[in-house]
Amino acid sequence: GKYTCGETCFKGKCYTPGCTCSYPICKKD
């Protein structure tokens, strides 16, 4: 996809579309 994951989760959520929290880092769905 056009989005890149890898930001830190914030309260278990990722704000980048298509990403989910794999604590502590957001990973692609």
Curated annotation (Swiss-Prot):
SUPFAM superfamilies recorded: Cyclotides (SSF57038)
* Domain remark from Swiss-Prot or TrEMBL: The presence of a 'disulfide through disulfide knot' structurally defines this protein as a knottin.
The post-translation modification note in this UniProt entry reads: This is a cyclic peptide. Contains 3 disulfide bonds.
Q: Does the keyword Disulfide bond apply?
A: yes
Crosslink feature (Cyclopeptide (Gly-Asp)) location: G1-D29
| Organism the protein comes from | Melicytus latifolius
Role, per record: Probably participates in a plant defense mechanism (Potential). Binds to and induces leakage in phospholipd membranes, particularly ones containing 1-palmitoyl-2-oleophosphatidylethanolamine (POPE). In vitro, displays cytotoxicity against cultured cells but no hemolytic activity towards fresh erythrocytes. Not active against Gram-negative bacterium E.coli ATCC 25922 or Gram-positive bacterium S.aureus ATCC 25923 up to a concentration of 64 uM.
Top-level taxon in the UniProt lineage:
Eukaryota
Listed InterPro entries: Cyclotide, Cyclotide_sf
Does this UniProt record's set of keywords contain Disulfide bond? yes
Name the Gene Ontology biological process terms: defense response; killing of cells of another organism
Pfam families tied to this protein: Cyclotide
Protein name in the entry? Cyclotide mela-1
For this chain, the annotated S-S bridges are: C5-C19, C9-C21, C14-C26
User: Which terms are listed as keywords in the entry?
Assistant: Cytolysis, Disulfide bond, Knottin, Plant defense
Q: What is the lineage of its organism?
A: Eukaryota, Viridiplantae, Streptophyta, Embryophyta, Tracheophyta
Family, similarity comment: Belongs to the cyclotide family. Moebuis subfamily.
